Swiss-Prot record:
It comes from Thermus thermophilus (strain ATCC 27634 / DSM 579 / HB8). It comes from the Bacteria. This is Ribosomal protein L11 methyltransferase. Disruption phenotype: Mutant contains unmethylated protein L11. Null mutant is perfectly viable. PANTHER family: ELECTRON TRANSFER FLAVOPROTEIN BETA SUBUNIT LYSINE METHYLTRANSFERASE (PTHR43648:SF1). One of its GO terms (biological process) is methylation. HAMAP family: Methyltr_PrmA. Methylates ribosomal protein L11. Preferentially recognizes free L11 before its incorporation into 50S subunits. This function is dispensable for growth and thermostability. GO terms for cellular component: cytoplasm. It is found in: Cytoplasm. Contains an N-terminal substrate recognition domain and a C-terminal methyltransferase domain, connected by a flexible linker. S-adenosyl-L-methionine binds at residues 107, 128, 149, 175, 191.
């Protein structure tokens, strides 16, 4: 196993993370001011990183030791080897290539917002489901969730995570267009990025019932005005905003 070590944090290096996965990274780990990207062998990358060969057992043991439960009240996101005795609702997620382990601000913002806005029995769309953590959380709150993702590689992991948590959301390969025939939905949650939210704003309205709610995150603070303008133009009314670090969540009503 080879590690490509970059100075910085996952948040600071967020713009280049897709390029690491496109280059063949099997996973990422933030540790002591660095981001480690794991590869089966060195490849040419256009970044200022350093390659280092590590033993599979060495890095895996260190990674497991450093990975802590992630609190997002009323939830806690756990790896399968974690134990937890608190009162929070457990979400057991196998860390891997799919986004959504609870260690990123946007995932925590979305989990907390789900708890505030989801009503038991709601039909929920998780757009860009990744690990399935938001769809799983919606089911645990009494919703009926559909998770969609354009990356077919993440869906088996999402399904395995759902089974691990004893819930049965439906997962589907595709974009928002693929989800529309299963709607309209009472609640939409999407952890994407500002420009895509802005482009999809009219389609979000189409996906929701009258009075439905849209929870949008993956938005950097300085890009939030773009989303606000697009959602207002699509006829949405603002419900709330929440922030953590450099990231925001914007909630809207249809």
């Amino acid at each position: 196993m080879w590690v490509y070590r970059l100075k910085g944090t996952l948040e600071a290096l967020d713009p280049i993370l897709p390029g690491l996965f496109d280059g063949g990274a099997r996973g990422l780990w933030e540790r002591e001011g660095e981001v480690w990207a794991f590869f089966p062998a060195p490849v040419d990358l256009p970044y200022e990183g350093v390659w280092e060969e590590v033993g599979d057992e060495d890095w895996l043991e260190a990674w497991r030791r450093d990975l802590k439960p992630a609190l997002a009240p009323p939830f806690v996101v756990l790896a399968p080897w974690h134990t937890w005795e608190g009162a929070e609702i457990p979400l057991v997620i196998e860390p891997g290539m799919a986004f959504g382990t609870g260690h990123h601000e946007t995932t925590r913002l979305a989990l907390k917002a789900l708890a505030r806005h989801l009503r038991p029995g709601d039909k929920v769309l998780d757009l860009g489901t990744g690990s399935g953590v938001l769809a799983i959380a919606a089911e645990k709150l009494g919703g009926k969730a559909l998770g969609v993702d354009i990356d077919p590689m993440v869906l088996p992991q999402a399904e395995a995570n759902a089974k691990r948590n004893g819930v049965r959301p439906r997962f589907l390969e595709g974009s928002l267009e693929a989800a529309l025939p299963f709607g309209p939905f009472d609640l939409l949650v999407a952890n994407l990025y500002a420009e895509l939210h802005a482009a999809l704003a009219p389609r979000y309205r189409e996906a929701l019932v009258p009075g439905g709610r849209a929870l949008l995150t993956g938005i950097l603070k300085d890009r939030a005005p773009l989303v606000r303008e697009a959602m207002a133009g699509a006829g949405f009314r603002p419900l709330e905003e929440a922030a953590e670090g450099e990231w925001v969540l914007l909630a809207y009503g249809r």
